[in-house]
Amino acid sequence: MDFLDFEKVFSFYSKATKKGFSPFFVPALEKAEEPAGNFFLDRKGNLFSIREDFTKTVLNHRKRYSPDSQIKVWYADFVYRYSGSDLVAEYQLGLEKVPRNSLDDSLEVLEIIVESASEFFEGPVIVEIGHTGVYEDLLKEIPKDLHEKVLNLIDTKNLAEIEFLSHMKKIDLSRVEKIIEDSIYRRSPEHLKTMDLPLSVREDLLSASSFLQEKFPTVSVEIDLTLARTIEEYCGLIFTIYDTSSSRLVAAGGEYTVNGEKGVGGSIFLEGKTC
């Protein structure tokens, strides 16, 4: 890690501690009883798990040591994931808060992540916000055996395939088409009031977009209702941040529910390298 990255860590630490987040430091390697996730055996045959996701690490730590307490932490360290046969280390800065009590908790996380990403990357950055409640509402009207197919097509914004599926199965997928069209052509928050959304979803998106536009007038805020299909635990408001100068995803996060408990978190992706 270079000097500029240390400056980013210090800047992030300053913002997080001002909001009451405590540091979270645990080893990336832990002894394991059985293979799970990313793991390896040392020369003596000891099995170790490798940290691949900070949210899971934080939740497991809380479950093990303080299951009934609130945890509100910031972190700065590597996660390890396989890309093909290569183990890749990615340095992340992030926040986690469990339990999540209100939308204000999510906006607090969003504020720190967006402010930091705006400073760390050349930009300008684009913040995309979505909501998993969109899928929950849409799927009520669709046969269960088609859920995964429809969700995959929403993922890829594939309007042509949605129209074909609607014709072949003789089911009305016009609301799905509208959600995809809105996510392609009507991404400005000003269109939220005319979108076909559950009231609670619309209110969350309006609150989050208004908050961001007021706090960060130079940041572009867009609505993408097709977000978050890749992380099953997401449940509620979600976001991604893109750096337009490098054309890459630089941060992501949102609300989640794990084992019936609500939380919120977000991560900034600083550095990736093959181990």
Swiss-Prot record:
Localization (cell): Cytoplasm
The keyword Membrane is annotated on this UniProt entry: no
GO molecular function: histidine-tRNA ligase activity
TM ranges: none
Pfam families per record: tRNA-synt_His (PF13393)
GO cellular component term of the entry, any: cytoplasm
One GO BP: L-histidine biosynthetic process
Summary of the function given for this chain in its UniProt record: Required for the first step of histidine biosynthesis. May allow the feedback regulation of ATP phosphoribosyltransferase activity by histidine.
Miscellaneous comment: This function is generally fulfilled by the C-terminal part of HisG, which is missing in some bacteria such as this one.
Name assigned to this protein: ATP phosphoribosyltransferase regulatory subunit
